[in-house]
Design a protein with these regions (language model features):
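Structural signature of the two symmetry-related core transmembrane helices
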Residues: 71-85, 275-291
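Paired small-residue
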Residues: 79, 83-86, 94-102, 303-311
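Helix-loop-helix hairpin linking two adjacent transmembrane segments in secondary transporters
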Residues: 91, 95, 124-126, 132-178
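Cytoplasmic helix-loop-helix junction between adjacent transmembrane helices
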Residues: 99-140
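C-terminal transmembrane helical hairpin of 12-TM major facilitator-type secondary transporters
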Residues: 277-319
Length: 319
């Protein structure tokens, strides 16, 4: 595969995450009203998706080691498109939650394989450079997801925001069929043996570096997705923004995420990995604390939320 093709594929495969989680958020209040669902039920369309996304990778990783990246990508993206279409057609919140759960598991195939492909094809230093270029593409997709979703919802209704990920998945699937060349040099026939799986997981869980960075990642994503799950209801129903205006607020957040990825490269050269991660932790803690203090003080406005999110999103981009 040509380097440009690899970067494009990686950007699309990684970008499927914000397409799936961010693009439909402006439509969440309208979706709830149309399906007669409570806010908690509607939020399950995100939390169930994320749970399936995380758990599926525990199985999809060994499957891709055994059978190769391309079969997992093909089956995963096909399932993603079908689940997205099922979500568009769902007549009830319960069926939508089921469709989104399948969509989350399928999304895991795309994101997991994208990172595995980098490891297959590149040495660590070269892989980091390729991944940084792909993450720039991811940043652009993340910036556009919520504004496009808000505009589509305002113009065509909430189901349009669920249809667009199906289109994105279909385009990505076509590119994988057309351009992707299997990246695993030697498939591992023992990858799915229970003993192999247990030994591998044991080695990983006993690694203190993994545990530390896993905790960091959980905190960073936990903070982000807790905000995402409630943000559309707060900004649209409480603060009175339109779907398009809400999308622009999310665009603001994504810009700071992209800025964080650039700041990360600069800080890595000056402070190393540990110093960079420590500084990102301080930023996230400062932003979250400020937001909490303002909320407890009764300050309710768009900027009381958007401004404290700046250091939080910077930190997320760094992490």
């Amino acid at each position: 595969m040509q380097p440009a093709t690899i970067v494009l594929l990686l950007a699309l495969l990684l970008g499927i995450q914000p397409i799936t989680t961010d693009l439909y958020l402006p439509a969440l209040p309208a979706l709830s009203q149309a399906l007669g669902a409570s806010m908690a039920q509607s939020q399950l369309t995100l939390s169930a998706l994320l749970l399936a996304f995380g758990c599926a990778q525990l199985v999809l990783g060994p499957l891709s080691d055994r059978f190769g990246r391309k079969p997992i990508l093909l089956w995963g993206l096909a399932a993603y498109v079908l689940a997205a279409v099922a979500g568009v057609m769902a007549p009830s919140i319960e069926l939508l939650i089921v469709a989104r759960t399948v969509q989350g598991a399928a999304m895991g195939a795309a994101v997991m394989c994208a990172r595995a492909v980098v490891r297959d094809l590149y040495a660590p230093a070269a892989g980091a450079r390729v991944m940084s270029r792909a993450l720039s593409g991811l940043g652009v997709i993340a910036c556009l997801s919520a504004p496009v979703g808000g505009l589509a919802s305002d113009l065509f209704g909430w189901r349009a925001a669920l249809l667009l990920p199906a289109v994105f998945g279909a385009v990505t699937l076509a590119l994988v069929v057309w351009r992707f060349v299997e990246s695993v040099p030697h498939k591992n026939p023992r990858a799915l043996h229970p003993g192999t799986l247990l030994r591998t997981w044991g080695v990983i869980l006993r690694n203190p570096t993994f545990v530390a960075f896993c905790a960091l990642t959980c905190a960073s994503y936990g903070l982000l997705f807790t905000f995402l799950a409630a943000s559309s209801f707060v900004f649209i129903q409480v603060l009175g923004l339109s779907k398009t205006q809400y999308g622009l607020v999310m665009f603001w957040n994504s810009l700071w995420y992209v800025a964080g990825t650039f700041l990360c490269r600069y800080w890595l050269q000056r402070h190393g990995v540990r110093g960079t991660v420590a500084r990102a932790g301080v930023l996230a803690l400062a932003g979250a604390t400020t937001m909490g203090v303002l909320a407890l003080a009764g300050v309710v406005s768009v900027w009381a939320i958007a401004l404290p999110l700046v250091p939080i999103m910077l930190a997320h981009g760094i992490n």
